Design a protein with these regions (language model features):
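Internal intein/HINT superfamily modules and their associated LAGLIDADG
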Residues: 1-261
Length: 261
């Protein structure tokens, strides 16, 4: 948790015209956290109850963080029981993307600020893990078996959050089950062979429902897409790739997403 003065100093750098990437690199604070501070400066108050299972359910305090976390969960997350009514949420983040690991942990803390978040090293990845009794209320898509073997549908309150923060939801899905690649070809122009590059985004998930949530949100955002095979969604038109670059990537440091993350 960063104090208010730290947040103000970071936002002062942004107001100078600095990019999120450069400020993140200088301060060591994730782009996700800095972006969240531009929308809400004050730290979220700590609370021991759950906004969803309270006697009168209320709105989440950081819906943008929730939209991002929901995308990560639907891509590479799971909710499992532990003991005495406690559950843990685990999201797999590749070692190659430490910024993604930071952003995932920040989002998890923002959604459940009163619970601890841990990083558990596994071969090739870090399992960002949060313990809480309330993950089943916050992520009602959890259930036995694999996500693509069961129905995945958003509750009305979740859909409202996704509709209000669509880019955060798309970022979470792409960061968990997507990639940005660059195709290239050569052409002879004026007797000279020239190389032309064509960046595109892919999102791959076995669940028809999760792919539909992704494409429905892209439709809302005006991003053109097409399905290239049974599990794969492609975004390749130049204007749509530019939109994705502006909101999803470049991601961390000076690197674009170039491998599955």
């Amino acid at each position: 948790m960063y104090d208010l003065e730290t947040r103000k100093r970071v936002l002062a750098l942004i107001r100078q015209g600095r990019s999120l990437n450069s400020v993140s690199k200088q301060t060591g604070i994730s782009r996700y956290a800095i972006r969240a501070w531009t929308m809400r400066l004050e730290p979220i108050r700590r609370t021991t109850d759950c906004p969803r299972c309270a006697p009168e359910p209320r709105a989440l305090e950081d819906p943008a963080a929730y939209a991002y976390l929901l995308g990560l969960y639907l891509g590479d997350g799971c909710v499992s029981p532990l003991r005495k009514g406690l559950y843990f949420l685990r999201i797999a983040c590749a070692d190659a993307w430490p910024g993604l690991i930071d952003s995932c942990a920040e989002a998890m803390r923002a959604v459940r600020p009163d619970n601890s978040v841990y990083r558990v090293q596994r071969q090739g990845c870090v399992m960002v893990t949060g313990y809480s009794k309330h993950w089943p209320c916050l992520l009602p898509q959890h259930g036995p078996g694999k996500k693509h073997d069961r129905v995945i549908a958003l509750e009305p309150w979740q859909q409202e959050i996704v509709s209000t923060h669509p880019w955060e939801f798309v970022r979470g899905l792409v960061h968990s089950d997507g990639c940005r690649i660059t195709n290239w070809t050569t052409k002879i122009v004026a007797g000279e062979r020239r190389r032309y590059e064509y960046p595109r985004y892919f999102f791959t998930n076995k669940s028809d429902d999760i792919r539909r949530l992704f494409t429905d949100t892209l439709d809302q955002l005006g991003v053109a897409w097409r399905q290239t095979n049974a599990w794969n969604i492609s975004v390749a038109r130049r204007a749509s790739v530019a939109l994705m670059d502006a909101h999803v990537g470049p991601v961390y440091g000076n690197n674009l997403i170039r491998r599955w993350v």
